[in-house]
Amino acid sequence: EILFSLKFFNHSEFLKIRNVRIEDVRPLKNEDMKPKGTTSLYDAIGNTIHYFITEKLKDSTCFDSLQIFISTDGLENTSKKYNSNSIKNMIEYCKHFNITLVYLGANQNAILEAAKIGITQDSALNYDETKETIDSAWRSVARGSKRTRTDGSAFQFLQAERVASQV
C-alpha cells in the first residue's frame, strides 16, 4: 500500500494531506502551489525527517520504505533550527530507515543545492516554471518512484527526464 502526505512550506509549514492512499489523492490545483513568503527549506526538511524517524522508532511497521520529495522554487534563506550540515547528517541517518530524499528545484541549480545537503545528483532535478516542464518533472518523479518500487534500484532521474524538465 502506498500512502501519500503533502506538506507546504515557506517561513512556516502546513500539512495539507497526511497518510492518504495514493489512489484517493485528488489532483492539486495551481492555487495550491503558489509560492509565497520566504524559504525555510532546511527547517521543513529537518522537521519532516524528524517526524518520520520518530514514527518509525515508535512503530517499526509504520513503513517499509519512504520517499520524501522536496520541491522548491527558492533557495534556503530563513531556517532557524537546522543548517546544511545538520540536514546532511540527518539524510545520511535516513539510510538506516530506508528513507530516500529527492530534490526538485526551480530557477536554481538543483543538483548543486541538493549536494549541499547530501542528496545525490541522480536524485536531483532542475525544472523551469512552466506548466509543461512542471508536469514533466512530476511525471519523472512518478516514473522514478515506480522504477524504485518495481526493481528495488536507487531513485534516479533519467537523462531524457532531465531534458524534458527544461525549456
Give residue spans per PLM region.
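Acidic, low-complexity intrinsically disordered regions
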Residues: 1-167
